[in-house]
Structures are given as C-alpha cells and as structure tokens.
Amino acid sequence: MSLRVMSPAMLNAWSQTLVRAMSTQGGAKNIGFVGLGNMGANMASNLIKAGHKLHVFDISKPACDGLAAKGATVYAKTSELAKNSDFVITMLPNNAIVDASYDEMTADGVNKDTIFIDSSTISPDLVKSLQKKISAKGARFIDAPVSGGVPGAEQATLTFMVGGTEAEYNAVKAVLECMGKKITHCGVYGMGQAAKLCNNMMLAISMIGVSEAMNLAVRQGLDANVFAEIINSSTGRCWASEIYNPVPGVCPSAPANRDYAGGFSSALITKDLGLASGVANASNSPIPLGSLAHKVYQSLCDKGLGNKDFSVVYDLMKKEKFSV
C-alpha cells in the first residue's frame, strides 16, 4: 500500500514498527528496568516488543510476574541486574527512593560501559549528585524523564526530555525510541528534569483550570460533552480537556470513567509541584499559580485522595464548598 493513501492511524503504527525494527539493527541490547508501576510496566513491555533482552526488578511480585510472562528475567537484587545490563532504566516515585536505589545498585561496582537512565521525576540537584557518583565509578548516568502519561507509555508515544552530553544522548536515543516518539536533548545533566518539572507544573494548573471551567459550565446547564467539544475546538483546547478530561463520560479512556483509579496519582503530582516550588525558590522565580496548584493538590492528599488520579480535582470542585 502506498504511504500516501495510508490513514494517519495506519501511518503511525507503521512508523512505530519501523523505529522498533531499527532500534535493534545493531543487535538486541540487555536492558535493565527498575520500577514497574503504571508507567514502568508499559515502558518495559515496549522494550520487549522491540526485541531487547529485558532484566527487571520491582518490590511488587505481581508486577515482576507480569513482565516475566512476556519474556523478562526477574532479579532479586538490582546490583546483579545492573551487572547484566548495557542500559539500566529507573522509573521510581521520589528522590529518596531513587537515591537509595542507585546506592544499592552500584554498591558492588558497575560495568564501565553501562549507561544508567533515570526516567523518574526528581530534583535537578539529585541528578547532578547521582551523575557525579556514577561517573566516579566509571559508568555513565543521564536524566530522561517522560511526559505522556499511562496512555503514552502503553502506546510507546512518550516524550523524553534528556539531560546529558550530546554523545550520551546519541547513545541512548534508539533505546528511548522504543518507548517514545519524541526524544529531545534538553542540555546538560538536570535539564531534562528542569523541563519535566516546568511541564508538570503547567499540567497541574491546566487540569485545575479545566475542572473549574467544566464545573461552572455544567452548573449553568451546559451539557459536559457539548462544552468539552467547544473547548477542544477553541482557544481553551489543551491535553487536560481533549485527552484526559476530568468529567466522567467525556473521554472514554480517561481515569474519570474508572472513579479516578490508576493514571497519574494526586500524590505524585503534589510531589512534583513541591520539587518545582523548590527549584523556583532557588532561582528566585515567581510561580503564583504553581504555588496555588501545589496547595490545591496538597489539600486533595490531606483529604485522603492521594491515590486517586490527579483529575479527581474535578470531583472536589463539584462540591458546594471548596477550600484549599
């Protein structure tokens, strides 16, 4: 079939298949993956689909079993996983866990050719600290956080924001392309995280804005689907409305249709907003809306909603009284 008559969906599927095929032209790589949560499990699965040999670790046995069923090798110790991997990708919840994981993983030494790739969302300062520690041991470390959520992880359409040298970026690009469609070199170590924190701050602000607007429209008598269609064909169009709408029934695949289960938890975006606030304070950058968004999501966590998807903020907006 000629490319010019392919539908957009068919063309995207074809291009993703081509990218994956090209990623293993030099031979399948041994890739370690630590952290098999909502994002990590899907990212790891796409590496297997691309033909790489996957080595995995997670504290959750069911998560490990799910990848083992697809062909991955499960390890009891991350240090052993790292010694058997050309690349090691980490996808973990916070600074403390990432820091401790790398200490454990590299305690017995590292292979000189291994490249460690952290795709968690952590502080730029921790990135720089880890890079120095691992470089001193003879290996390489870069930051490569992601955007695109669980749908992007499932479909291998994530955006990767890479911090490191140009040579390191080129060395990891083919591996990252197995999991994403946009791989951007943001600059030196920590710049990937700087981009990610700014993006997530904007995401939180936009989700609150969409939730406020949707709630106001519904209370005026507008149908939620009608108003969402208007937003998505007007100047208010954004990812939080078009792909991840917080109102149940508007976007079939959004967490709003599963009682806000799964997805990107309110606890995690609260953590990210805290990191963004720290970076803003250190650089003397005003973030009035970012600070307010942090308070809103901290309020959600205080109300016991930290495990719910961050779009649950709409559910709180529906209540007659809402306060931060």
UniProtKB/Swiss-Prot annotation:
This protein's record includes keyword Transit peptide: yes
Active-site residues, Swiss-Prot/TrEMBL: 196
SUPFAM superfamilies, alphabetized: 6-phosphogluconate dehydrogenase C-terminal domain-like, NAD(P)-binding Rossmann-fold domains
Transit sequence range: 1-25
Pathway assigned to this chain's UniProt record: Amino-acid degradation; L-valine degradation
One Pfam family from the record: NAD_binding_11
Catalytic activity entry: 3-hydroxy-2-methylpropanoate + NAD(+) = 2-methyl-3-oxopropanoate + NADH + H(+)
EC number of the protein: 1.1.1.31
Binding site for NAD(+): 29-58, 92-93, 121, 271
UniProtKB keywords: Branched-chain amino acid catabolism, Mitochondrion, NAD, Oxidoreductase, Transit peptide
GO biological process, one term: valine catabolic process
GO molecular function, one term: NAD binding
The name this protein goes by in its record: 3-hydroxyisobutyrate dehydrogenase, mitochondrial
The species this protein was found in: Drosophila melanogaster
